[in-house]
Design a protein with these regions (language model features):
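A residue-level detector for the "anchor" residue at the start of short, highly conserved motifs
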Residues: 1-178
Length: 178
């Protein structure tokens, strides 16, 4: 769905973050090279839908009557009041749940995440990992990155997404982990 003329769009450049509160009271931290679009009429009396391209951390204001939906090109995340991170830079999108509960819709599937669970898409399939260190996926909002046993090529891709830098990694080094 494309934005309507009255919709508000927040966009961040490489190397920058944006923190904002939506009209319904939800707090959002938008990562570098990301775009968030929402209706200025999203005031808790109707639908609470946003569109995300990139990455954002959400602290959703509780409202069981009006679910909060994050629509990305790869999945839809639905919450009624919770904290979670959505990474939707590319088709290897992911959701990390800090607290509360969210439903994630991927194609014809719907899955529920519980606190400290991480859902990632790989080759069009959803994989859920439980009891993860949520800080690894959310520390970017505090100006940090954590890598643990991560292939060098993945680290370089993450840095490229955030800082618009290019790396030329020799094939024999690509799978080294850090």
């Amino acid at each position: 769905a494309s934005p309507l003329p009255d919709d508000v769009t927040i966009a961040t450049k490489f190397g920058s973050l944006s923190r904002t509160h939506l009209p319904d009271g939800t707090a959002v931290c938008l990562n570098a090279n990301s775009t968030l679009t929402y209706s200025p009429a999203m005031n808790g009396k109707g639908t609470r839908n946003v569109m995300l391209q990139g990455e954002a951390y959400f602290e959703v204001k509780a409202d069981a009557e009006h679910p909060f939906k994050v629509n990305t090109p790869y999945m839809t995340v639905t919450a009624t009041g919770t904290e979670f991170n959505v990474n939707a830079y590319d088709s290897s999108a992911s959701v990390t749940l800090i607290n509360g509960r969210v439903n994630v819709g991927v194609e014809n599937q719907s899955m529920t995440l519980n606190p400290s669970e991480h859902l990632s898409l790989a080759d069009g399939r959803a994989v859920i990992n439980g009891h993860i260190d949520t800080e690894k996926y959310c520390c970017w909002k505090d100006g940090m990155l954590i890598f643990d046993d991560e292939p060098l090529v993945n680290i370089c891709n993450r840095l490229q997404q955030m800082y618009d830098v290019e790396f030329d990694v020799a094939p024999e080094l690509a799978s080294l982990t850090f």
